[in-house]
Amino acid sequence: LLSGNYKTKFNQIISNKLAVLSILFFSLHVLGLLWTDDLKWGLTIVKKMSDFLFLLPILLTITKKEYIKYYISAFILAMTLTEILSYLVWFEVIDPLHKATVGNPTPTMSHISYNPFLTFGIFLIAHEILFNKHLSKLYKYVYVFFMVTMSINMFITGGRAGQVMYFVMLGILIFQYYGRGRKVRATIISLIIISSIFLGAYNSSSIFQHRMNEAVKNISIYNTDRNKNTSVGQRITYTINSLEIIKNN
């Protein structure tokens, strides 16, 4: 921020579509304050969304391409340490941190945020295993170990959005690995791996089983008024409203 050259940085931000979308996304929340019925809650949401205004655009101006591998390594290390803390809470070796509980051990952030970050960490590790031809056997074994432990960790926490992202990520990785010429094989392998992991997690993790049963129940009775205020009901409502807005505009 204090390094100067602000004109170049500004041009760098506005020329990046992701950064512009990030700023517009935040701006929509600010604009929404004009018609909200609960200004206090609206300001709370705006505060939560402030990362979209500051974090991504600022990171874009200070990151350098030649250091990307170090950024990725630092992120993987951070998620590995967080995962270890999660297991320590789960096994009751340490007292729960932040808002974590033994039943939902997400020590450094809420389960809503934790699982998407964990999914991204798993994706980066799996990508290294599958596509880095220069990866030594030792690193490969270490990466496989943490990919497995992170995947298990995914299903002892309650973040359904991250779990959905996890299964989508697996499909993407498999299709990337087999390429465009072997779509049928990639589809079959994706279905086998994803369904096997899902069934294994469902039968072995009580919290995952409970969250899945809850989601199915909420969807099945969505049309009743008492169900629309659940997390699943709200997501369905937001999706329907968004599609209507897109359709009408």
Predicted regions and their residues:
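Transmembrane signal-anchor hairpin modules in multi-pass inner-membrane enzymes, especially those
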Residues: 1-30, 62-69, 73, 128-141, ...
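Aromatic-anchored transmembrane helix interface
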Residues: 18-25, 39-63, 70, 74, ...
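Alpha-helical transmembrane segments of multi-pass inner-membrane proteins
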Residues: 30-31, 67-97, 109-180, 192, ...
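Membrane-interface helix caps and helix-loop-helix hairpins in membrane proteins
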Residues: 34-43, 155-157
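Membrane-interface helix termini and inter-helical loops of multi-pass transporters
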Residues: 39-41, 94-105
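Extracytoplasmic catalytic/substrate-binding loops of multi-pass membrane glycan-assembly enzymes
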Residues: 50, 226-239
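Luminal/periplasmic active-site loops of membrane-embedded glycosylation enzymes
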Residues: 112-119, 218-232
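A membrane-periplasm/extracellular boundary helix in multi-pass inner-membrane enzymes
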Residues: 177-226, 240-248
